[in-house]
């Protein structure tokens, strides 16, 4: 499973982090697949490559709590939510409308048949 998480690269008492996409089984400061951005907690500066972060989130990467908060502050999680989940609800309403139309079309009116009987 791929995770978006922080990798510490700062020196002692001067933390600095990289936001990376990495395998969940790798150590905190181990190898990573791709560099997404940086975070400096001392002055609160966040730099994120939105295209890469969005790509990884769409492919199913799970952000850690801290990374999710950083992405939310930058507005990326809201964009992802709107595209991923709102699109599903509009699809389901369109599908529901299409099935209702099919149901109306398949119902044929019953006609009475009369037979002429000669006496």
From Swiss-Prot:
Q: Which InterPro entries match?
A: Ribosomal_bS16, Ribosomal_bS16_CS, Ribosomal_bS16_dom_sf
A Gene Ontology molecular function term for this protein is: structural constituent of ribosome
| UniProt KW keywords | Ribonucleoprotein, Ribosomal protein
What are its GO biological-process terms? translation
Please give the superkingdom of this protein's source: Bacteria
List the GO cellular component terms.
cytoplasm; small ribosomal subunit
Keyword Nucleotide-binding part of the UniProt annotation:
no
UniProt biased composition (Basic and acidic residues): 89-103
Tell me if Ribosomal protein is a UniProt keyword of this record: yes
Q: Where is this region: Disordered?
A: 89-119
One short Pfam family name for this protein? Ribosomal_S16
- HAMAP family of this UniProt entry? Ribosomal_bS16
NCBIfam families from the UniProt entry: S16 (TIGR00002)
Regarding protein family, the annotation reads:
Belongs to the bacterial ribosomal protein bS16 family.
Protein name as it appears in the record:
Small ribosomal subunit protein bS16
**Organism whose genome encodes this protein:** Spiroplasma kunkelii
Tell me the name of the encoding gene: rpsP
């Amino acid at each position: 499973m791929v995770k978006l998480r922080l990798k510490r690269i700062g020196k002692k008492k001067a933390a600095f982090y990289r936001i990376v996409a990495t395998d969940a089984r790798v150590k905190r400061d181990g190898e990573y697949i791709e560099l997404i951005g940086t975070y400096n907690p001392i002055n609160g500066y966040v730099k994120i490559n939105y295209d890469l972060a969005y790509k990884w989130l769409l492919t199913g990467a799970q952000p850690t709590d801290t990374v999710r908060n950083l992405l939310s502050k930058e507005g990326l999680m809201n964009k992802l939510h709107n595209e991923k989940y709102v699109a599903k609800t509009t699809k389901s309403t369109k599908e529901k409308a299409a099935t209702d139309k099919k149901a109306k079309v398949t119902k044929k009116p019953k006609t009475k048949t009369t037979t002429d009987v000669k006496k």
